[in-house]
């Protein structure tokens, strides 16, 4: 079983965790409808990069 040799300080723990935070999702405005959507994702009404890709 793995057991640590020496205790890691709060500072070292914090330094290790400094890159773990999540960033906010990148949003873009659709050229045809002006709707906000996530990057590289189809909008709610079925448009992707200005073209209709999903017919509902």
UniProtKB/Swiss-Prot annotation:
Compositionally biased residues, Basic residues: 7-16
Region (Disordered): 1-39
Keyword Plastid: no
Cellular component per GO, a single term: large ribosomal subunit
Keyword terms: Ribonucleoprotein, Ribosomal protein
Keyword Ribonucleoprotein: yes
GO biological process, one term: translation
Comp. bias intervals (Polar residues): 21-31
Family: Belongs to the bacterial ribosomal protein bL32 family.
Record-given protein name: Large ribosomal subunit protein bL32
Species of origin: Shewanella piezotolerans (strain WP3 / JCM 13877)
Gene this chain is encoded by: rpmF
């Amino acid at each position: 079983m793995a057991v640590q040799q020496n205790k890691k300080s709060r500072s070292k723990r914090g330094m290790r965790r400094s890159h773990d935070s999540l960033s906010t999702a990148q949003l873009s405005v659709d050229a045809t409808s002006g709707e906000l959507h996530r990057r590289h994702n189809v909008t709610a009404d079925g448009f992707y990069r200005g073209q209709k890709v999903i017919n509902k």
